[in-house]
């Protein structure tokens, strides 16, 4: 069994159903108890074992002795003028990560963090500027969703995206466990299409994803060639486009009507010209794709400028003219530093950002 803690009580919040069933095996209990606990935690929002009334008193006592359910603390709760909401979530060791809720007319998307800080060092992102502390546990990932649900109307969260702080695929097992909790019929009951893992391009882990999950995949592309992408996304030096694009194509090859979302932050005069659009079209030819163009969100000390809206529209039109689906992401939550690339949290014992070895 993969447990959240190596010693002491087992943290149940982040255990997917097979791991929760394995935990009950160690207690000599029937495996169906996993379904009961998941429903209490994720559907009824009950975290006190004494209130889980369909469990025997003896089992509740054993759970108190061998397990725990801990929610992270809300250090700050901010709401933007456009309705976007950001929670700064304090973890037990003092690290703070951020989760952002983005309401839209037909859906509500929660953007969650997978690491305290980020080791990737992307040159256009504030998160990487703060350094990297550690991976989050599955419980700390799932806990962000529980915190958000406590502050939102029932059913407000329809989509979950791993697009907050950190590189999800460098924290592979906890991220996959959390995603399984989100899609389980006894968990959050979200469609796998409504859970998205966003990566900067850890090829080995994308190939591993293909064997263990079929949630949606988004890739932070940001450049149509290796020379430019090496500058913007240092991971590209070991995971070049010649490896990344085939791995992504293979991930959706046996998934009908699925496509890869390519995230592309628009940097003034850097990656936003007509020749970049033409090159991008060539790169993505034959891969079912959607390109999400993201206006750059400046932050203190940023080395890049924001592409003018007119040029963003022109870039999108160039892609659309040649049959490639392209959307322009509306900037949300920038007045509370909750927009893409602005999440910084509060990182304890941070190490300088550097590209970690693929998981």
Swiss-Prot record:
At the top level of its lineage, which domain of life is listed?
A: Bacteria
Q: Name one GO biological process term.
A: rRNA base methylation
User: What's the cofactor?
Assistant: [4Fe-4S] cluster
Kindly list the positions annotated as binding S-adenosyl-L-methionine.
166-167, 198, 220-222, 297
Q: Where is the active site?
A: 98, 340
Pfam name, any one: RlmN_N
Name the Enzyme Commission number(s) assigned to this protein.
2.1.1.192
Could you say which residues bind [4Fe-4S] cluster here? 118, 122, 125
Note describing how the cofactor binds: Binds 1 [4Fe-4S] cluster. The cluster is coordinated with 3 cysteines and an exchangeable S-adenosyl-L-methionine.
What's an example of a GO molecular-function annotation for this chain? Answer: tRNA binding
Q: Which UniProt keywords apply?
A: 4Fe-4S, Cytoplasm, Disulfide bond, Iron, Iron-sulfur, Metal-binding, Methyltransferase, rRNA processing, S-adenosyl-L-methionine, Transferase, tRNA processing
Reaction(s) the record says it catalyses: adenosine(2503) in 23S rRNA + 2 reduced [2Fe-2S]-[ferredoxin] + 2 S-adenosyl-L-methionine = 2-methyladenosine(2503) in 23S rRNA + 5'-deoxyadenosine + L-methionine + 2 oxidized [2Fe-2S]-[ferredoxin] + S-adenosyl-L-homocysteine; adenosine(37) in tRNA + 2 reduced [2Fe-2S]-[ferredoxin] + 2 S-adenosyl-L-methionine = 2-methyladenosine(37) in tRNA + 5'-deoxyadenosine + L-methionine + 2 oxidized [2Fe-2S]-[ferredoxin] + S-adenosyl-L-homocysteine
Gene Ontology CC, one term: cytoplasm
Q: Which cysteines are joined by disulfide bonds?
A: 111-340
Methyltransferase: present as a keyword of the record? yes
The record's subcellular location field reads: Cytoplasm
Q: Which PROSITE patterns match?
A: RADICAL_SAM (PS51918)
Residue span, Radical SAM core domain: 104-329
EC class name: transferase
Q: What is its main location?
A: cytoplasm
In its keyword annotation, does this UniProt entry include Membrane?
A: no
The family assignment reads: Belongs to the radical SAM superfamily. RlmN family.
The entry's function note states: Specifically methylates position 2 of adenine 2503 in 23S rRNA and position 2 of adenine 37 in tRNAs. m2A2503 modification seems to play a crucial role in the proofreading step occurring at the peptidyl transferase center and thus would serve to optimize ribosomal fidelity.
Q: What else does UniProt say about it? A: Reaction proceeds by a ping-pong mechanism involving intermediate methylation of a conserved cysteine residue.
Put simply, this protein is called: Dual-specificity RNA methyltransferase RlmN
Give the organism the record lists. Answer: Halorhodospira halophila (strain DSM 244 / SL1) (Ectothiorhodospira halophila (strain DSM 244 / SL1))
């Amino acid at each position: 069994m993969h447990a959240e803690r190596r010693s002491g009580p087992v943290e149940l919040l982040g255990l997917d159903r097979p791991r929760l069933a394995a935990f009950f095996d160690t207690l000599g209990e029937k495996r169906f108890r996993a379904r009961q606990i998941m429903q209490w935690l994720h559907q009824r929002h009950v975290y006190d074992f004494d209130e889980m009334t369909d469990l025997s008193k003896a089992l509740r006592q054993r759970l108190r002795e061998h397990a725990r359910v801990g929610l992270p603390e809300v250090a700050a709760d901010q709401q933007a003028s456009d309705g976007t909401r950001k929670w700064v979530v304090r973890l037990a060791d003092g690290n703070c990560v951020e989760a952002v809720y983005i309401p839209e007319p037909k859906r509500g998307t929660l953007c969650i963090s997978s690491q305290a800080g980020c080791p990737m060092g992307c040159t256009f992102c504030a998160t990487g500027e703060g350094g990297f502390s550690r991976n989050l546990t599955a419980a700390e990932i799932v806990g962000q969703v529980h915190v958000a649900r406590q502050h939102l109307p029932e059913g407000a969260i329809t989509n979950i995206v791993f697009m907050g702080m950190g590189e999800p695929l460098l924290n592979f097992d906890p991220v996959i466990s959390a995603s399984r909790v989100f899609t389980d019929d006894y968990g959050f009951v979200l469609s796998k299409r409504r859970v998205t893992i966003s990566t900067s391009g850890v090829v080995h882990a994308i190939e591993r994803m293909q064997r263990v999950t079929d949630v949606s995949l988004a890739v932070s592309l940001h450049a149509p060639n290796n020379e430019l992408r090496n500058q913007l996304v240092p991971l590209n030096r070991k995971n070049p486009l010649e490896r990344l694009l085939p791995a992504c194509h293979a991930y959706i090859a046996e998934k009908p009507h699925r496509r890869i979302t390519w995230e592309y932050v628009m940097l003034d005069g850097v990656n936003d010209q007509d020749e970049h659009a033409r090159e991008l079209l060539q790169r993505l030819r034959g891969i079912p794709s959607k390109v999400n163009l993201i206006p750059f969100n400046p932050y203190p000390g940023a080395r890049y400028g924001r592409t003018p809206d007119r040029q963003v529209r022109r870039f999108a039109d160039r892609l659309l003219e040649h049959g490639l689906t392209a959307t322009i992401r509306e900037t949300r939550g920038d007045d509370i530093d909750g927009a893409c690339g602005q999440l910084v949290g509060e990182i304890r014992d941070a190490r300088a950002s550097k590209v970690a070895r693929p998981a």
